[in-house]
Regions:
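Feature recognizes metal-dependent phosphohydrolase scaffolds
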Residues: 1-307
Length: 307
C-alpha cells in the first residue's frame, strides 16, 4: 500500500456540505465531487452522525439541510472511485456511530443530537433511523463492513478517542507479542453485522472504550509520565510511532508528547454554530516518503507546518 500522502479529517457531525468543502480544499475531489486525489488516502476520524448539539443555535439554513445519509453513501461512492487510482476514502468508527446501540430510541438524546431534517430523510425511505443504525440491522451492518475501529497507515495509528489497555490486552497476538489490528476490526465488524457479541471494551461508555476515552486528548499538554505510559501502549503495535485522533475539540489541529499524539477535531460542523461561509476549516496532511514524516495543516488559505 502507498501511504505517501494521507489526509486526515476530524469529526464532521452530519455536515455534508462542510465535508465536501474539506475534500475540495485538500485537492482530492473536483467541483463536481469526483475523486482527483490519485493515491492519497483520506482517513476521516469518525463521528459522521448527529448534526445537532443541545443549547447551540443552528442557522435556519443548516437546520433544514440533511447530511447523515448523504455522508454515509458519499464515502462509499468516493472510496470506490479512489480505489481505481490507488487511493482510499475511509471513515473509522466514532462514539456517535455507536450511539444507536448505547441509547437506542432515547427521545431526549434524539432531540438533543439529531436534526429533524436527517430523521425525515430516513423516513422518506421508510426507514426508522435508530433501528437502521443498530447492530445487526442494515445500517449497522453497513458500518460493520466498511468502518474499522482502528487503522494503521505506515507509522501512524488512527482511532477516534484513545487506545485503551483493555483493547490492547484482548488483542495481543501470542506469536508476535503485538496488537492484532485485523482481529480488533474483525470482532467489531462481526458484532455490528449481528454475527458476534460486542467486544467487552465496547460494552459500555466507560474509560475502557476507545471511542469514548479522552485520555489522549483531554489535556492540551500531557506530562512526561503520561507520555511515557502512552509510548508503551503505542509500542504494542508493529512499527507505530504516532496516534491521530478526533473526539475532543480544539481551536486548531495540535500535537503533544513530541508529536506522538495528533488531535484533529476542530468543530468543523455547523452543529457547533457558524455559517457555511465563515467556518474556518482544517485538515491534517501526512507525507511519508522515507525519513521523518512531514505534517501539515491544510486550510483554505494554503497549508502550514504542524509544529
Amino acid at each position: 500500500m502507498n501511504f505517501n500522502r494521507i489526509v486526515s479529517i476530524g469529526d464532521i457531525h452530519g455536515d455534508f456540505k462542510i465535508f465536501k468543502r474539506l475534500l475540495y480544499m485538500c485537492n482530492v475531489i473536483d467541483k463536481s465531487g469526483n475523486w482527483v486525489g490519485g493515491s492519497t488516502y483520506v482517513i476521516q476520524l469518525g463521528d459522521t452522525l448527529d448534526g445537532k448539539r443541545p443549547g447551540v443555535r443552528m442557522s435556519k439554513k443548516y437546520a433544514q439541510e440533511s447530511g447523515e445519509l448523504e455522508i454515509i453513501l458519499y464515502i462509499l461512492i468516493l472510496d470506490s472511485q479512489a480505489k481505481l487510482k490507488g487511493g482510499r476514502v475511509i471513515s473509522i468508527l466514532g462514539n456517535h456511530e455507536l450511539y444507536p446501540h448505547y441509547f437506542g430510541d432515547d427521545k431526549q438524546f434524539i432531540r438533543d443530537y439529531v436534526k429533524k431534517s436527517d430523521i425525515d430523510v430516513f423516513k422518506f425511505h421508510d426507514i426508522d433511523r435508530t433501528t437502521f443504525l443498530q447492530p445487526g440491522n442494515i445500517g449497522g451492518s453497513l458500518l460493520g463492513r466498511t468502518r474499522p475501529l482502528i487503522l494503521q497507515a505506515g507509522e501512524f495509528l488512527f482511532i477516534h478517542g484513545s487506545i485503551t489497555d483493555a483493547m490492547i490486552k484482548s488483542n495481543i497476538n501470542p506469536r508476535t507479542g503485538k496488537v492484532d489490528i485485523y482481529k480488533i476490526n474483525s470482532d467489531v465488524s462481526k458484532w455490528l453485522m449481528g454475527k458476534g457479541k460486542v467486544p467487552h471494551y465496547l460494552e459500555d461508555t466507560g474509560k475502557d472504550n476507545p471511542v469514548f476515552s479522552r485520555v489522549y486528548s483531554e489535556a492540551k499538554t500531557l506530562n512526561v509520565n503520561n507520555c511515557n505510559r502512552i509510548r508503551k501502549q503505542i509500542d504494542k503495535f508493529h512499527n507505530a510511532n504516532h496516534v491521530v485522533m478526533g473526539h475532543s475539540t480544539y481551536s486548531s489541529i495540535n500535537t503533544t508528547c513530541k508529536r506522538m499524539l495528533i488531535r484533529t477535531d476542530v468543530s468543523l460542523s455547523r452543529a457547533f454554530g457558524g455559517e457555511l461561509e465563515n467556518k474556518k476549516l482544517q485538515a491534517l496532511e501526512i507525507l511519508q516518503n522515507g525519513g521523518e514524516p512531514i505534517l501539515n495543516i491544510i486550510t483554505e488559505m494554503g497549508k502550514k507546518p504542524l509544529k
